[in-house]
Amino acid sequence: TFLYNKWQINIFSNISSSEQTHMDAILLLLNKYNLLDPVANNFAGVFANGTLQNLYNQLTTQGSASSLDALKVGATIEDLDIYDLKTALTKVDNQDIRLVYENLMKGSRNHLRSFYSNILVAGGTYTPQFITQAEFDAIIDSPMETGK
């Protein structure tokens, strides 16, 4: 990933591998329901959706400032993922999709815990940008989760 290449912090490499597993889970759903993969031909860091491209550009710029800023960007991405998945779950009744989203959310909560721990070790703090402070605190104060 961009931030791993910039800072060589292991958490970025570890989570990148996990994120590939998440992408594979979504691809299984796309294949099962005969849907086109909207990112099949995209290179890393390239998004057809302008909003996502702008967010990527903004976050990579922020994460390039310092290794601590990079860790905060990692936490922000997981924070946003949790928010987006929670929102998506309110609109989905297909049990296959719900199961994948719920497992993705577990992964994102675990990643948020890991990034936050690294932020603290680096002497920083993190304030959630998308989920509430109460949700963030509940995640941070709970143990790592496993998938189904």
Show the residue positions of the predicted features.
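All-alpha RGS (Regulator of G-protein Signaling) helical domain and cognate RGS-like helical scaffolds
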Residues: 1-148
